[in-house]
Amino acid sequence: MCLSVSLNFHRVKDNKPIALVAKQSILVYKVLEVRGKHYYTPYMSKAVNFDDEYGMFFYKTTRFSIDRAYFGGQYHYGVLRGVHSYFDFDKANDSSDFLNKIFDVLNIHYAIIPKGSKFYIGSNCDIASSNLVVFENEAKYNENKEYFGDEPIEFSEYYKKFGTELDSK
């Protein structure tokens, strides 16, 4: 999956969009492929093994990979490396409906972008983040979300509260 960076949310500096920093944990949705009793990321087929006790899986990406292309009279930026998810459940569902034509079975999982993580907002209600915690199911999310120090909020609430403050602290 490649995220097309929405320049409505990001400034560009030195030919790269500037990542935002989560000021509060953000609730997002991760689409995973199911093969038997195992989970994988679509496209990259990275195995996702949930912790037996807490039902969580931690992603950590140390650096984003940004690609720049010029077409249609302007530059477009894509995030190739980063942890991809959706901030809108309906868009995640639309994506899984489309991807089900390619992959056998897909599930949508609750996930959290932890406070302090860097992230890019895409043009299709998608997000690429430097960190992501994916939960096996909604019950595991509800049981364990408190361990992240603050209450995760939906992106729409996050945007109302913080906008796109470009604060890297």
Model-derived segments and spans:
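Conserved NAD+-utilizing ADP-ribose enzyme module
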Residues: 1-83, 89-169
